[in-house]
């Protein structure tokens, strides 16, 4: 047991599942149901961000056709593990996230004008907070007993074109 385990307010098994044994997965077993996928998102959305914003968008890729299109956009080292995963999630962010202000911070609209006035600020804030939420997503995956294999080796412009053709 480490000092971190001794100081944690959650039990050691949870610390192990979320952190100590949570290495990036390269192989997967079992299935992920729609209910389990929803539970992952439900946990993710409550993680703290600036203004409690929720810019992260999760696109679950289940169909063989969609998965094949995604796999074609990945670097060679990521293709086999993505093809064999029971569920794949594309994590992106809503480029107009601040338009949902009343949903995540009702009654306190003053800061929204700051983001409406600066596309660069809105983009950087949305991107940064979506990265926080991506971390929460991985923690949610691990806390529900699943493996996670985050990756960055991909042609993201091709993924955007295929999965987000409207550009948002």
Provide a role label for each language-model segment:
Residues 1-168:
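Acidic, surface-exposed loops and disordered segments
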């Amino acid at each position: 047991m480490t000092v971190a385990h001794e100081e944690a307010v959650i039990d050691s098994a949870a610390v192990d599942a979320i952190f100590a044994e949570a290495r990036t997965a390269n192989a997967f077993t079992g299935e992920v149901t729609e209910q389990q996928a929803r539970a992952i998102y439900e946990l993710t959305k409550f993680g703290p961000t600036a203004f409690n914003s929720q810019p992260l968008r999760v696109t679950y890729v289940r169909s063989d056709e969609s998965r094949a299109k995604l796999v074609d956009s990945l670097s060679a080292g990521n293709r086999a593990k993505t093809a064999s995963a029971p569920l794949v999630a594309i994590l992106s962010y809503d480029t107009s996230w601040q338009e949902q202000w009343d949903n995540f911070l009702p009654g306190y609209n003053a800061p929204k004008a700051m983001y409406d006035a600066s596309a660069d600020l809105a983009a950087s804030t949305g991107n940064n907070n979506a990265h926080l939420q991506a971390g929460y997503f991985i923690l949610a995956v691990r806390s529900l007993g699943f493996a996670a294999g985050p990756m960055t080796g991909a042609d993201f412009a091709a993924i955007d074109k295929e999965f987000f053709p409207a550009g948002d």
